[in-house]
C-alpha cells in the first residue's frame, strides 16, 4: 500500500553503491537511511563533478507518500542545479525558489548542502535550518537560514571552511539525536559526539553501523518514530591500491615508509601488513590476478595516546583469516608456505585484529595503539 510506495520512492533515490568511487583514494563515503514505520522524507545524495564533491542531507517536514514525493523533487533539483552551478548558497537559493513556487503540499525541507574542492580541501557550504554536521568531533558552525520551500527569493548566506587530510565529516538528521526510549528521553547530541569520538579512526561504514547499533540499544522497545539518516565523508586518507600480485609487495613497503609512523613501529607494522596483504593476494582471487587489494591508514589522537588503524579490503571470495589456525612454527622457513606465519604473526604484532564481510567485500582491520 501507501507505505510500500513511499519506501520505494525514497530508496530509489538514494545512492546505493559503496564505496561509491572505487578508483578514488581521496574520498571514502558511506550513507544510509533507516526508514521509520511511517516514512519520513529523509534524503542524502552526493556525486563528483570536475574534482568537486557535491553532497547534501535533508529532512522533509511531513510523512508518507507526500513527503517522499517532495524528497524526490529535492533530490532531482539538487542534481539538475549542481550540474551547472558550483556555489553552495546559489544552489540552495535556486532549489528554494523552485520548491517554493511549486509547493502545493506546503512542506518545507531542512537541508545541509556542501561543495568540497577535492584538491584543496576547501569546503563551501550552506545550511537551510538543518542540524549542524560534525567535523572531527566538533559541531560545524552554521548560520540560521530558513529551510527551503518556505519563502521564494530568500537570500541564503554562504559559509566556508577548509578540511584536511584524514578529516571526518558526519552528517545526520534529527531522527538520530531525537530518537526516544520508552521513558521519552532523547538520544541527544552528547551521546552522538561521544560515539563519534570513540570511532574516529574507523571506516565510514563502521561508524554508521556502530551509531545505528547504539541508537537501537538506547531506544529499546520504543518504536522508531522518525527516519534515521547518516552520511559520513572521510577526506584524503592515506591509501594504496594494488593488484593481487605478490610482486606488488615492495610497493606496500614503500608506501608504509612514506606514512608518518613512529620510527620504532615501522618494522613491525610493515611485517604485519605484508603478511596480511600477501594472505589476501594468495587466497581472495583464486586463479585470477586482476583482483584489487585496497589498504587504508588512519591515525587518531586521544588523551590516552595515538591509535593507528589499517584497513585491508578486497572484493574476492569470502575469507576470514582470523579463523585460520596458527602456523606450525616448528617448521623451517623454507617448509612454511609464504604468508603461512600469517595471522599468528599479525596477532603478535598488532593490538587488535578483526574481520568482517560487508558490501561483498572482505574487510580486515588491524589496530596498533602507541
Task: Identify the residue ranges that each predicted region occupies.
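… and, occasionally, acidic/histidine-rich disordered N-termini of signaling adaptors
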Residues: 1-170, 220-248
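Short active-site segment of divalent metal-dependent hydrolases/proteases
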Residues: 62, 177, 278, 282
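Cytochrome P450 core scaffold surrounding the K-helix E-X-X-R motif
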Residues: 135-137, 180-186, 319-323
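C-terminal catalytic subdomain
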Residues: 164-171, 176-239
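Conserved polar catalytic motif of the HATPase_c/GHKL fold
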Residues: 174, 274-275, 279, 348
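Flexible, glycine-/charge-rich segments associated with ATP-binding catalytic modules
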Residues: 214-243, 347-370
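Conserved short strand/loop->alpha-helix "switch" segment adjacent to the catalytic nucleotide/phosphoryl-transfer site
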Residues: 253-278, 334-337
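Conserved beta-strand-loop-beta-strand hairpin that lines the nucleotide-binding pocket
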Residues: 281-370
Amino acid at each position: 500500500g501507501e507505505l510500500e510506495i513511499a519506501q520505494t520512492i525514497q530508496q530509489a533515490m538514494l545512492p546505493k553503491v559503496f564505496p561509491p568511487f572505487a578508483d578514488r583514494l581521496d574520498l571514502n563515503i558511506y550513507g544510509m537511511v533507516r526508514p521509520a514505520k511511517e516514512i519520513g522524507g529523509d534524503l542524502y545524495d552526493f556525486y563528483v563533478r570536475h574534482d568537486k564533491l557535491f553532497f547534501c542531507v535533508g529532512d522533509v517536514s511531513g510523512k508518507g507518500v507526500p513527503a517522499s514525493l517532495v524528497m524526490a523533487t529535492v533530490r532531482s533539483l539538487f542534481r539538475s542545479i549542481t550540474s551547472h552551478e558550483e556555489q553552495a548558497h546559489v544552489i540552495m537559493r535556486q532549489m528554494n525558489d523552485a520548491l517554493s513556487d511549486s509547493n502545493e503540499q506546503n512542506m518545507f525541507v531542512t537541508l545541509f548542502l556542501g561543495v568540497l574542492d577535492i584538491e584543496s580541501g576547501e569546503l563551501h557550504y550552506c545550511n537551510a535550518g538543518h542540524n549542524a554536521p560534525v567535523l572531527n568531533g566538533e559541531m560545524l558552525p552554521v548560520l540560521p537560514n530558513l529551510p527551503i520551500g518556505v519563502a521564494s527569493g530568500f537570500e541564503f548566506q554562504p559559509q566556508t571552511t577548509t578540511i584536511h587530510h584524514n578529516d571526518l565529516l558526519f552528517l545526520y538528521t534529527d531522527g538520530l539525536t531525537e530518537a526516544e526510549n520508552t521513558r521519552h528521553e532523547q538520544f541527544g547530541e552528547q551521546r552522538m559526539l561521544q560515539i563519534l569520538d570513540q570511532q574516529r579512526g574507523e571506516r565510514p561504514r563502521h561508524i554508521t553501523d556502530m551509531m545505528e547499533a547504539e541508537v537501537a540499544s538506547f531506544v529499546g522497545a520504543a518504536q522508531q518514530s522518525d527516519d534515521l539518516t547518516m552520511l559520513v565523508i572521510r577526506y584524503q586518507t592515506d591509501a594504496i591500491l594494488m593488484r593481487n600480485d605478490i610482486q606488488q609487495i615492495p610497493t606496500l613497503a614503500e608506501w608504509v615508509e612514506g606514512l608518518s609512523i613512529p620510527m620504532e613501529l615501522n618494522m613491525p607494522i610493515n611485517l604485519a601488513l605484508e603478511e596480511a596483504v600477501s594472505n589476501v593476494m594468495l587466497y581472495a582471487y583464486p586463479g585470477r590476478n586482476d583482483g584489487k587489494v585496497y589498504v587504508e591508514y588512519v591515525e587518531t589522537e586521544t588523551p590516552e595516546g595515538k591509535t593507528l588503524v589499517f584497513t585491508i579490503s578486497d572484493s574476492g571470495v569470502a575469507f576470514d583469516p582470523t579463523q585460520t589456525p596458527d602456523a606450525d612454527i616448528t617448521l623451517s622457513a623454507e617448509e612454511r608456505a609464504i604468508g603461512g606465519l600469517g595471522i599468528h604473526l599479525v596477532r603478535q604484532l598488532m593490538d587488535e585484529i578483526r574481520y568482517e564481510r560487508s558490501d561483498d567485500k572482505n574487510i580486515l582491520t588491524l589496530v596498533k595503539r602507541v
